[in-house]
Amino acid sequence: MAGNRARIAVDAMGGDHAPNEIVAGAIRASEELDVDILLVGDRPSIEASLQHHHPSPNIEIVDAEGAIEMHEGISELRRKPKASINVSMDLVKKNRADAVVSAGHSGAAMGAATLRLGRLKGIDRPAIGTVFPTLLAGKSVIILDVGANVDCRPKYLEQFALMGTIYSQYVMGVEQPKVGLLNIGEESSKGNDLALATYQLLENNKTIPFIGNAEGRDVLSGRFDVIVCDGFVGNVLLKFAEAVGEIVLQIMREELPQGWRGILGTAILKPNLKKLKQRIDHAEHGGALLLGVAGVCIISHGSSYGPSIFNAIRLAKEAIDHQVLDRIKASQENPTPDSVQASVEK
């Protein structure tokens, strides 16, 4: 493997379609992206999957014993120290890998990252950030937390807003991100105790470009670049958005005329349908970034196929290339917008 390329540890045993689809996505990433891949898991199973692809010099297998199954609790992390997700996190901890991608048990991925990598200084709770498309073509919004913390304190949401701002600015390329707090109304007086207290924190924090509350109708409007909420609300929002995307695609398929008219119509609309799918299909986004731990971790959907794993690896590479971890660290050490960039670029 090359020395200066990004090294991504991929949990080959995690997900509904492991290891075949995980390997397929990893192989494609090794060929199309400037990355080296460490496939972590059961060697015979991984080797059997690799036989369906052309050999790649950028692929290495790292042995692990078993996985944390979807029906198991995160307590299994301690009982299975050599499970694929634990070994993957250890590779980052030992500087053998720069990031982890897993489509396995999301709770286990979060637990392993927190236990083995630890939290970044100044971050009380890691958050899962997911990128959503908006009504404005080419513009997305990152929403966090979408599942790591079902109960939150105001200061947690304040930290989420800071991490989301950094991600939006440096990875998504938004020069001046606009941050919103998900709430039941635009007015600062609206919401429960958590929302009211968080609003005051965000409004008084001059390092966060907070512009006010975001109602449900604003989430995909393109008005906001970052939206923060607790993990309970965020996870419901995530699952609902995924379902709506699938329903829209299914309705479009059903409503296309049958027979030769349908064939002709599909041919004409194919480029537009492809663009629509790219905008609303969760597989196109690859996964969610676990922000706040001392390592780049991407949590993919459990039902991920090869294309989604490829996009998850691409997402991990973008986080590495844009020094997301270093920028979050700098924001805690020097809490001003300008010092974040200066500290990283020294």
Swiss-Prot record:
Functional pathway: Lipid metabolism; phospholipid metabolism
Main location class: cytoplasm
Gene3D superfamilies according to UniProt: Isopropylmalate Dehydrogenase
Transmembrane portions of the chain: none
InterPro entries linked to this entry: FA_synthesis (IPR003664), Phospholipid_synth_PlsX-like (IPR012281)
Catalytic reaction(s) noted: a fatty acyl-[ACP] + phosphate = an acyl phosphate + holo-[ACP]
Complexes and interactors: Homodimer. Probably interacts with PlsY.
Protein name, UniProt field: Phosphate acyltransferase
Provenance organism: Crocosphaera subtropica (strain ATCC 51142 / BH68) (Cyanothece sp. (strain ATCC 51142))
